């Protein structure tokens, strides 16, 4: 519940209106709920990356005309990666639907990943937006972007590169398939 409280307080700080708060908060809680549904269904044993993406992105994966393509080898994510990655992907999709490729009927998003199989296997995941509105120069990162950076770097012990290129957002997420850190507070201050 502390995570929900933290999501609420951070969302209220960055929402200009009550309807904006309500929609943003509901979306974040839905992403958290999807992650916990996955974990319950798998008895906290993890899930395939493709399945996680399909679950989180289901509102955008329309039968017969998907605007999001997913491509990569089978990857089993450990249970403790499910919530942070779900939250990060939700924020990418939300930002794409508000400001990026998914805000334009012609826009598309491609998500691809690979696994670097060295002594410490890690996932390299790319989110690339196409045919959306151009991103104005000097675009500032909002709270959603801050959340993406936090959950990937702190909770997954990974790294994030976000390129707000005029042609569309390019995101690179890299994280190990094992994590030694338990789910940290998602938003900077919540304990659970």
Roles of regions detected by a PLM:
Residues 173-192:
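C-terminal end segment of the histidine kinase catalytic
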Residues 106-120, 129:
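Short beta-strand/loop element within the Bergerat-fold HATPase_c
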Residues 22-38, 42-62, 112-114:
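Short beta-to-alpha transition helix within the HATPase_c
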Residues 133, 165-172:
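Glycine-rich nucleotide-binding loop
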Residues 65-73, 125-127, 161-163:
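Conserved transmitter core of two-component histidine kinases
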Residues 62-108, 139:
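Conserved short strand/loop->alpha-helix "switch" segment adjacent to the catalytic nucleotide/phosphoryl-transfer site
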Residues 8-19, 43:
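Short acidic helix/loop segment immediately C-terminal to the autophosphorylated histidine
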Residues 133-161, 191:
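ATP phosphate-binding glycine-rich loop and adjacent ATP-lid/helix-beta elements
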């Amino acid at each position: 519940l502390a995570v929900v409280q933290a999501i609420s307080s951070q969302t209220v700080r960055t929402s200009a209106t009550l309807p904006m708060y309500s929609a943003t908060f509901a979306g974040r809680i839905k992403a958290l709920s999807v992650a916990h549904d996955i974990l319950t269904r798998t008895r906290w044993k993890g899930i395939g990356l493709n399945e996680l993406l399909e679950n989180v992105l289901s509102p955008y994966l329309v039968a017969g005309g998907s605007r999001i393509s997913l491509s990569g080898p089978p990857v089993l994510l450990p249970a403790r990666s499910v919530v942070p990655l779900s939250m990060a992907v939700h924020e990418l999709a939300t930002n794409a639907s508000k400001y990026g490729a998914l805000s334009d009927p012609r826009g598309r998003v491609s998500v691809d990943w690979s696994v670097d199989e060295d002594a410490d296997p890690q996932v390299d995941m790319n989110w690339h937006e196409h045919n959306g509105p151009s991103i104005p120069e000097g675009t500032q990162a909002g709270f959603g972007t801050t959340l993406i950076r936090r959950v990937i770097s702190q909770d997954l012990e990974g790294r994030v590169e976000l390129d707000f290129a005029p042609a569309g957002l390019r995101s690179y997420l890299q994280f190990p398939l094992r994590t030694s850190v338990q789910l940290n507070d998602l938003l900077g201050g919540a304990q659970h």
